[in-house]
Amino acid sequence: MAHKKAGGSTRNGRDSESKRLGVKRYGGQVVSAGEIIVRQRGTKFHAGVNAGMGKDHTIFAKETGRVKFEVKGPLNRKYVVIEPVA
């Protein structure tokens, strides 16, 4: 009778679900208060004027306005600023 040896097992075959990180609203776009601008791990972007940071480092708008990305300070940090719409 024909026999076939058992195939080996593997310890691979798993992957985590993607977290959908990144910039959600770009420079020049108008956002309303509470809207998420950037989802990130760590502080790639910092919260500037009229922007807040959640406990998972999400940057969100505190006021309705136009999104602006700025680089400033001695460490050349990237800030997200919301300029009020007149």
UniProtKB/Swiss-Prot annotation:
Assigned GO CC terms: cytosolic large ribosomal subunit
Biological-process GO terms, alphabetical: translation
MF terms (GO), sorted A to Z: structural constituent of ribosome
Pfam families in alphabetical order: Ribosomal_L27
InterPro entries: Ribosomal_bL27, Ribosomal_bL27_CS
Keywords: Ribonucleoprotein, Ribosomal protein
Region (Disordered): 1-24
Domain of life: Bacteria
Family to which the UniProt record says this protein belongs: Belongs to the bacterial ribosomal protein bL27 family.
Listed name of the protein: Large ribosomal subunit protein bL27
Biological source species: Alcanivorax borkumensis (strain ATCC 700651 / DSM 11573 / NCIMB 13689 / SK2)
